[in-house]
Design a protein with these regions (language model features):
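Hydrophobic faces of well-ordered beta-strands that scaffold small-molecule active sites
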Residues: 37-39, 97-101, 147-149, 169-171
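Conserved small/polar residues in nucleotide/adenosyl-binding loops
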Residues: 266-272
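Iron-sulfur cluster-binding cysteine motifs and their immediate structural context
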Residues: 240, 244-264
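Catalytic cores of alpha/beta
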Residues: 153-166
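Glycine-rich phosphate-binding active-site loops on the catalytic face of alpha/beta enzymes
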Residues: 164-186
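Extended, intrinsically disordered, low-complexity segments
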Residues: 182-237
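Glycine/Thr-rich beta-alpha phosphate-binding loop at enzyme active sites
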Residues: 43, 47-143, 178-193
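Long, low-complexity, polar/charged, intrinsically disordered or flexibly structured peripheral segments
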Residues: 1-11
Length: 276
C-alpha cells in the first residue's frame, strides 16, 4: 500500500488570516511536501461595494453585512502578487497550483435564523459572487490560474462552470433539497462529455459572460413572490423516516410518486392519474 495518501491539498484559512501566513503555509505544502496546492479565496476579494450592489440588484437587499470582513480579509492587491509567486514556484517544481473559489461569506443573523451573530451564505445567492470572483481572477491571469469551484453550483449551472474550464466542482447546498444525493445523477448526466482529459486554460470570455448572466438569471435572483414553507409538521421516526414531500404538500394528497416513475417510462395510465 502506497504511503502517499494523496498528492494535493486545498488550504482554507480563517477569515482575517494575514497574506504572509497564507503564502508561508502554501509554500511549505509545495516546497517541502511536494503537493499540488490550491488556496481557498473569499468573496470579500470582490470588495464591499460590488457585493452590496450585486445583492441589492438581485433582491437580496435584506441580507445584512458590513465592511469589516472586506477590510480584515485578504486584499485583492495582496492576493495577485502572492498567487503569481506561488504559480511560479509550483511551475518550477512541476506541480499544479490554483485557487478554490469560494470560501464562506458571512452575513448577520437578524431574524433568529441561528443562535449566533453571523451565519454563512450559500447556494444560489452565493453563486453570482463566487463566479464573479472566478471571472475577475481569470481575467487578471489571462486564464492561466487554475480554479476549483464551490459556491452555488447545481444542476442549472454545472455544465456552464465546467465548460469554462473550471473543475473539480464541489457542491453541498443542493444536496439538502428534495432528492438528496440522487441529484448527483442529474448533474453527472449534464456534464458527461464536457470535461476534457487535460486542463489547458480557462475560457475567460465564456466565464465573464456566465458571471454577467448570473446577476439576472431567474434561478439565482430572489423571487418576488415569497416561496411557501414546505416544511412538514408530520412526525417521523428517527430511522426510515423518508417520505415524499410532494405527497404531503399536495392539497388532496395524491400519491404522486406512484405515477412519477411510470411517466418517465411512458407507462402512464390516465384513469388512475387524471390530474397529470
Amino acid at each position: 500500500i502506497s504511503p502517499q495518501i494523496c498528492n494535493s491539498a486545498t488550504l482554507s484559512t480563517l477569515h482575517g488570516c494575514p497574506p504572509q501566513e497564507i503564502e508561508r503555509i502554501a509554500t511549505y505544502l509545495i516546497q517541502e511536501k511536494g503537493l499540488n496546492t490550491f488556496i481557498k479565496c473569499n468573496p470579500t476579494l470582490l470588495g464591499y461595494e460590488f457585493a452590496r450592489k450585486t445583492m441589492d440588484e438581485m433582491g437580496y437587499d435584506y441580507m445584512v453585512f458590513g465592511d469589516f470582513h472586506f477590510r480584515d480579509d485578504l486584499q485583492y492587491e495582496d492576493a495577485v502578487p502572492m498567487l503569481t509567486r506561488l504559480m511560479k514556484l509550483s511551475d518550477e517544481l512541476g506541480l499544479e497550483f490554483g485557487v478554490k473559489i469560494t470560501n464562506t461569506f458571512p452575513v448577520d443573523v437578524t431574524r433568529n435564523e441561528l443562535p449566533s451573530e453571523e451565519m454563512y451564505m450559500s447556494g444560489k445567492a452565493l453563486f453570482p459572487l463566487s463566479i464573479s470572483l472566478a471571472a475577475k481572477l481569470s481575467a487578471e491571469f489571462a486564464g492561466k490560474l487554475r480554479i476549483s469551484y464551490s459556491g452555488g453550483a447545481d444542476y442549472y449551472n454545472i455544465d456552464k462552470i465546467v465548460g469554462c474550464g473550471i473543475w473539480p466542482v464541489t457542491m453541498a447546498t443542493t444536496l439538502l433539497k428534495t432528492g438528496g444525493y440522487q441529484r448527483f445523477t442529474q448533474v453527472a448526466d449534464k456534464v458527461e462529455g464536457i470535461c476534457p482529459k487535460k486542463w489547458e486554460r480557462i475560457d475567460v470570455d465564456a466565464l465573464k459572460k456566465l458571471a454577467a448572466d448570473a446577476i439576472t438569471d431567474g434561478h439565482h435572483v430572489k423571487n418576488i413572490k415569497p416561496v411557501p414553507n414546505r416544511k412538514s409538521t408530520k412526525e417521523v421516526p428517527l430511522l426510515d423516516c423518508f417520505y415524499a414531500p410532494c405527497s404531503e404538500g399536495c392539497p388532496i394528497h395524491q400519491d404522486i410518486p406512484q405515477y412519477v416513475a411510470p411517466v418517465s417510462y411512458t407507462h402512464l395510465t390516465l384513469p388512475t392519474t387524471p390530474y397529470v
